[in-house]
């Protein structure tokens, strides 16, 4: 290996989004508004759930954690993207790149596992309504949340440590707007076979298993409804599960489109656009999906604002 190839890099250059220079400021303003909407929307849901005692239920415990996960997941990539869109040298330090990988995996997986917990909650609420409070005890709910955090910590740490053992030499240009693992593996000048095997095995478990559990929950929900078909039962099921099913479809639809669709000549552009869907669009839409047709959230919003208004008048 030549001396040139032995040069160890200290930072990576992020190519960012394939946006023409004349449209750069327009897209910067658009992404800034979308990010601020994401932060504000998820913060409102978290604050409402904390302040309103009517929302201190298992479903809203999971929802508050999901909102926190969405807020942080978007914050892992968006601030750096916005900064680099205004910079002449869109770079990220080596340590910052590893940190971005860790938190990207952590909050992405956390949202995934919380969707499983929410699916189980909906399953119990519809199939065992009389035993709901007994089954979904505070202890079980907290255990599901803690288990989600522990599993995601392990997964994110595993990949980050494996990535840290790789050597990166001459090429330091990442054709993405954040430190994507697959893009980084292509830049490594050391053996990446262990990383690739671990990614395949663990990703299969952490994506396929949660999706299978969610699917099983909804199969049993549909089966339970069909046993006693009534317009009231169907309405209750859709009103209970509609928001969660929309979020699940949005999340897994994007992931399937990104990782399972056939590659093409412009696969880099496709990957970038699909990544924007689950790092920017999905976290922004989730608060609206859960609040627009949710009477509990609307009621909590009215109660909190009315309470604050009365306090101000006094």
UniProtKB/Swiss-Prot annotation:
Protein name as it appears in the record: Olfactory receptor 1E16
Write out the topological domains of type Cytoplasmic: 51-57, 119-143, 218-239, 293-314
PANTHER family in the record: OLFACTORY RECEPTOR
Gene name, per UniProt, is Or1e16
Sugar-bearing residue positions: 5, 265-266
Could you tell me the membrane topology recorded for this protein?
Answer: Multi-pass membrane protein
Q: Does the keyword Plastid apply?
A: no
Please provide the record's keywords in A-Z order. Answer: Cell membrane, Disulfide bond, G-protein coupled receptor, Glycoprotein, Membrane, Olfaction, Receptor, Sensory transduction, Transducer, Transmembrane, Transmembrane helix
Intracellular or extracellular location(s): Cell membrane
- UniProt-listed GO biological process terms: G protein-coupled receptor signaling pathway; sensory perception of smell
Which Pfam family is an annotated match for this chain, by its short name?
7tm_4
Distribution of this protein across tissues and organs: Olfactory epithelium.
Q: Which cysteines are joined by disulfide bonds?
A: 97-179
Described purpose of this protein according to its UniProt entry: Odorant receptor. Activated by a lily-derived aldehyde as well as other odorants. May signal through an inositol 1,4,5-trisphosphate (IP3) second messenger system.
Membrane-spanning parts = 30-50, 58-78, 98-118, 144-164, 197-217, 240-260, 272-292
